[in-house]
Amino acid sequence: MPKIIAAKTIVTCPGRNFVTLKIMTDEGVYGLGDATLNGRELAVEAYLTQHVIPCLIGRDAHQIEDIWQYLYRGCYWRRGPVTMAAIAAVDTALWDIKGKIAGLPVYQLLGGACRVGVMVYGHANGETIDETLDNAAVYAQQGYKAIRLQTGVPGMSGTYGVSKDKFFYEPADSDLPKETIWSTERYLRSTPALFEAARERLGDDLHLLHDVHHRLTPIEAARLGKDLEPYRLFWMEDATPAENQASFRLIRQHTTTPLAVGEIFNSIWDCKQLIEEQLIDYIRATVVHAGGITHLKKLASFADLHHVRTGCHGATDLSPVCMGAALHFDLSIPNFGVQEYMRHTPETDAVFPHAYTFKDGMLHPGDAPGLGVDIDEDLAAKYPYQRAYLPIARRLDGSMHDW
């Protein structure tokens, strides 16, 4: 058996902060796992260092399920974003080790490929509708079949999804939370115009997506979904805060626009009702936030029973280690829908060399043993941690709103 003899965390900031767990075995094989929790990275790093790593030493690295249960049930204070990100890092690293020892890519260990590649969607955004659609046209020319559209809301600077750079979006970029303003009324008036213009310019063949980012009440979300029906969206994401899962029932009753939610979910219990009652069409839980490949595979199987497909979160707050793991997962499940894909900075790609490649609107994880993603520790050390917060939002009257 490959025995775990050491493990360590690597914190680096090649454009944004990432926490990577490296697990070493007595056979000389190591595995990597992503433990990044956007804006709270050091909390997970401390949890791993102080509470998880000491419990791993001497264990059989092949016993992935048992180690997962040990870390989940054994901590008593189960679930939550910090605990589940730490468990995810361990789980992902163990799958990486297992694949390397077997000489197989992880997707082969998960049952083999169900498709030739993983359809991904890019992010097109801009201060104006024309600017957003100009950027969308670039993605279409690059071969993307699915594109998320976000645009500025008139009279509101710093709207969610509008980046400072044309294609790189890093919202966690300030030493203290940046304050933005929000008006639901202006947003509801302007958003349908974006998609009307998009269909006129981009045609009917592209899949179009939109992220509300938890900002609407259920009835407001129902109204927006109804207004967007003529433009046949692939999905409307995070239409309302999902703490109350039953709130999606009201939205579902009023619109046929497909609904997606789940990037902030940490376990199957956060979305059990949503899936069981078919209140959503896509579940967006991802490897690093939902306990790793082991738990996400179970969640996807449960979703498959209820005709819910996956659409894993894949923004740049996840490192290439997580993206690689997500692609192996995506390739292996029958109910895959789409994978979010935001390109990392060149500095990040240099720190995390990877085997996955893009072609014709799809990513493929490659056939290197394990995850096919590595880390250059010397280069990572040149990019020290930098504290960074996500923005916050206030309504026009000064009260707090969901960002």
Curated annotation (Swiss-Prot):
Binding site for substrate: 38, 123, 263, 284, 313, 317, 340
GO biological process per UniProt: amino acid catabolic process; carbohydrate catabolic process
Cofactors named for this entry: Mg(2+)
UniProt GO MF annotations: magnesium ion binding; mannonate dehydratase activity
Lyase found in the keyword field: yes
Matches recorded under PROSITE patterns: MR_MLE_1
Similarity comment: Belongs to the mandelate racemase/muconate lactonizing enzyme family. GalD subfamily.
Cofactor note: Binds 1 Mg(2+) ion per subunit.
Catalysed reaction, written as an equation: D-mannonate = 2-dehydro-3-deoxy-D-gluconate + H2O
EC number: 4.2.1.8
Binding positions for Mg(2+) per the UniProt entry: 211, 237, 263
Keywords: Carbohydrate metabolism, Lyase, Magnesium, Metal-binding
Top EC class of this enzyme: lyase
Superkingdom: Bacteria
Protein's name in the database: D-mannonate dehydratase CC2812
